[in-house]
A protein has these predicted regions:
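N-terminal cap/lid segment of alpha/beta-hydrolase-fold proteins
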Residues: 50, 54-57, 100-143
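The serine-hydrolase catalytic nucleophile loop
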Residues: 155-168, 351
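Alpha/beta-hydrolase active-site loop
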Residues: 194-216
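Hydrolase active-site cap/lid region
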Residues: 239-319, 342
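Short beta-strand/loop motif that positions the catalytic acidic residue
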Residues: 334, 340-342
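Conserved alpha/beta-hydrolase "acid-adjacent" motif
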Residues: 345-352
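Catalytic histidine neighborhood in serine/cysteine hydrolases
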Residues: 359-376
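Catalytic active-site module of serine/aspartate enzymes centered on a nucleophile-bearing elbow/loop
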Residues: 369, 376-401
Length: 401
């Protein structure tokens, strides 16, 4: 389904947040009319037009709030936040474009205004971490002691979008939910300039410490759920944080360098060269690097986003950083019940079976298919199918039925 653009990056980000529609995070008509105002390939216009739509909704939300129309104000702020979020990903890169910082600030502000209007309100939290704080939100599942789901992000998203990707569906089932952004994510990357790190157990440990100070959290029933690159980060965290009682990796991932080697093989790199990555002569890789830069989607994924997220300057440096992001030497330390997902058309899920096979803990593998509409990355075309199966699994693990 094409909405507007021939450029795959523009079109992907136009469609990106359609999955928020069931929770009133966007409207298809607003998306179509905004996209129609943007000339093909014009990134400045992209930022301007999505910002203009978000500004209009934000102003309308303020007017609704002034006349005590709380529900209308909340819904308008939520959609404004989504469109501010949409405004800046095409500008990713190092040094961080001031428009990325401004877009993120507006996104977070609109979400915060909406969060205060939920019943119960969604509570902002600041999690202490290595002399700074990690931004997050706490959702109460109701009175009494209840299990907690901690949601961890991946490469692309901000904590605000995890409202739709994790939190609301879990809260509806009676779970407390804590979502946060860590190094290399959201505000911590965009405004604080802190890049991604491999040792996610070091990040999650103080998050669990903080979670145990929240009202009504059952310390024996804490789950960690990661989506997108969180499908690496969450298992890595579970290998070193034993207070986690359940783990969800959506999708399951493996050593990052192995995924890169597989990609280079598809580009026609000889197998002996691919196996030696990253310790090969850079001149042998330059034709592949040039092909990556020519491809709009790959250039955005690896040059604009990847180098920026990891705080490196070259694709060779990126490959070297990948070595640290591995599970093969830690998977045996994961002891809690674990759910691994894999969507049929998701290349990020290519190594989900490797992770599942290597696990020695109680484990479940759920595959999502294109035929049921859930075959895309993180099942975003049918996220409710993910919620049904993943949270049914967790209900059984935690005795929520």
């Amino acid at each position: 389904m094409k909405i507007q653009f021939d450029d795959p990056v523009f079109e992907a980000w136009t469609q990106r947040f359609l999955f928020t529609m069931p929770e009133r995070g966007c409207e298809i008509g607003e998306i179509k009319t905004t996209a129609a105002r943007i000339p093909e390939g014009n990134r400045d216009a992209w930022y301007q037009e999505w910002t203009a739509t978000a500004d209009r909704l934000s102003a309308e939300a303020e007017a609704c709030w002034a006349r005590s129309a709380r529900v209308s104000a909340r819904d308008l702020y939520m959609r404004a936040s989504t469109y501010y979020r949409t405004s800046y990903p095409l500008l990713y890169g190092s040094p961080t474009d001031p428009r990325v910082k401004a877009g993120y600030a507006r996104e977070a502000e609109a979400f915060a205004r909406a969060a205060a209007l939920f019943d119960p309100p969604i509570a902002p939290v600041a999690i202490p971490f290595e002399g700074m704080t990690l931004p997050g939100w706490f959702y109460s599942g109701g009175p009494g002691t209840r299990p907690l789901i901690i949601g961890t992000n991946g490469y692309d998203e901000t904590v605000q979008i995890m409202h739709y990707g994790h939190a609301v569906a879990a809260q509806r089932r009676g779970y407390h939910v804590l979502i946060f952004d860590g190094p290399g994510q959201g505000r911590v990357l965009i405004q604080d300039g802190v890049p991604m790190r491999a040792d996610w157990e070091t990040v999650v440990r103080p998050v669990v410490d903080f979670a145990l100070t929240l009202p009504g959290v059952d310390p024996a029933r804490i789950a960690l759920a990661g989506w997108s690159f969180g499908g690496y980060l969450a298992p890595r965290a579970a290998s070193g944080e034993k207070r986690l009682a359940a783990l969800i990796a959506d999708p399951g991932q493996w050593d990052m360098i192995e995924a890169m080697r597989a990609m280079f093989l598809r580009f026609g790199v000889p197998s002996e060269v691919a196996k030696a990555l990253p310790d090969v002569d850079e001149s042998a890789l330059e034709p592949i690097f040039a092909a990556i830069r020519r491809d709009p989607q790959l250039n955005w994924s690896f040059v604009q986003r990847g180098l920026w997220v990891h705080g490196v300057d070259t694709l060779t440096d990126y490959l070297r950083v990948c070595i640290a992001f591995r599970l093969s030497d830690r998977v045996g330390a994961i002891s809690c019940p674990t759910l691994i997902t894999a969507a049929e058309n998701d290349p990020v899920a290519a190594f989900a079976g490797h992770l599942y096979d290597a696990l020695t803990c109680p484990k479940t593998l759920i595959r999502f298919t294109a035929a049921e509409g859930a075959g895309d990355h993180c099942e975003v075309s049918a996220r409710s199918v993910y919620f049904q199966r993943a949270y049914d699994w967790l209900d059984n693990v935690f005795g929520m039925r």
